[in-house]
């Protein structure tokens, strides 16, 4: 399922050859993202991103679910891809996911947008460690 989801997004992005259409598609993903404004707290703030960004996680059973918010629709759209891939997975599965797995998805984005995804993925891994689970 994880691989299929990555491949699905990779295929869609590979078919978009115009940067403005890519941003339009990413913005459409941002509109689909369910945001919880209550996560906009100092402990959920993600340092290092170009715009204000927040992420939190909850555990339901043995599955992890992330909540995300940002002042940028492009960031929201890119993170929507990440959340579609990681939400509902086990800690063990999420720990295996690296930025390299997203290389084809972010290849058409400017370096700063690529860095933002890397920073958010790093923060997600950090949040998992804070759960105290040693899987």
Range-by-range predicted roles:
Residues 58-72, 83-87:
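Conserved interaction-surface patches within small, structured recognition/assembly domains
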Residues 91-97:
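Short conserved catalytic/interaction loops centered on acidic-Pro-aromatic/His motifs
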Residues 2-52, 58-60, 64, 97-100, ...:
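N-terminal intrinsically disordered, cationic/polar leader segments
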Residues 79:
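Primarily the active-site beta-strand->alpha-helix module of PP2C/PPM metal-dependent phosphatases
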Residues 86-90, 117:
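Ampiphathic alpha-helical segments that act as solvent-exposed interaction surfaces
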């Amino acid at each position: 399922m994880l691989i299929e989801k990555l491949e699905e997004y990779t295929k869609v992005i590979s078919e978009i050859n115009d940067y403005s259409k890519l941003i339009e598609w990413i913005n459409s993903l941002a509109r689909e993202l369910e945001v919880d404004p209550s996560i906009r707290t100092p402990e959920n703030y993600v340092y290092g991103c170009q715009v204000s960004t927040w992420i939190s996680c909850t555990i339901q059973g043995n599955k992890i679910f992330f909540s995300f918010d940002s002042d940028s629709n492009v960031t929201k759209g890119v993170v929507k891809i990440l959340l579609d891939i990681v939400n509902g997975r086990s800690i063990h599965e999420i720990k295996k996911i690296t930025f390299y797995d997203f290389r084809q998805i972010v290849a058409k984005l400017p370096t700063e947008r690529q860095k933002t995804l890397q920073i958010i993925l790093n923060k997600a891994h950090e949040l998992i460690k804070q759960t105290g689970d040693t899987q």
